[in-house]
């Protein structure tokens, strides 16, 4: 263990295991003890945007995955596919392959978006009437004269700046705590469905799997003595 690294403290409530460099930064992401693999790593970014568009909550999730088989090695899903059905009827598919981003498909066309790109129809129509560049520059990281707050349709480049602006103005940031909770919860739901290997039913209001003891057990984990927290999960 590196001399300046408190391995016991770093493990927190997870099981105490011998130090292994791969279990710490950066690769802790590929161990279920500490993270949720690509589903929670990149998924939290993309599902956040996707659920802004869906404007509903998932009620049924189906998942399948392949897992590594190396002893004492990475244990998160490496090949995975999850399908979410939302309360409003929308279906969202999440997979480990394909372009890194979100594809919205509707009656009027398709739009691809990620954290730096938005393209497709009707987005291409904006080339004839583009968004003012000043709107995009306004929230750049180094703009100390950025507007005090963002409107609903303003482009937000500096999320940290938007957060501090909203703290000062007592307003809701473009990416608020509720949407973040729902985004990461949706990622975990996908992992739970993949672990069970079947379809699970989800009550988004009660935040439980009704009548599904197996899935419900995966909502929490055993907590190591000295690091217990009250999660509120039964």
Residue ranges and their predicted role:
Residues 1-22, 121-124, 220-221:
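Core domains of carbohydrate- and sulfate-ester-processing enzymes
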Residues 5, 75-79, 97-99, 106-107, ...:
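Short, solvent-exposed loop/turn segments at the edges of secondary structure
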Residues 8-88:
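Rossmann-like dinucleotide-binding domain that binds NAD(P)(H)
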Residues 18-21, 56-64, 91-94, 111-115, ...:
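Acidic/polar loop patches that form or flank catalytic/metal-binding clefts of enzymes
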Residues 32-40, 66-71, 143-153, 166-179:
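Active-site rim elements
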Residues 83-155:
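NAD(P)-dinucleotide binding in Rossmann-like oxidoreductases
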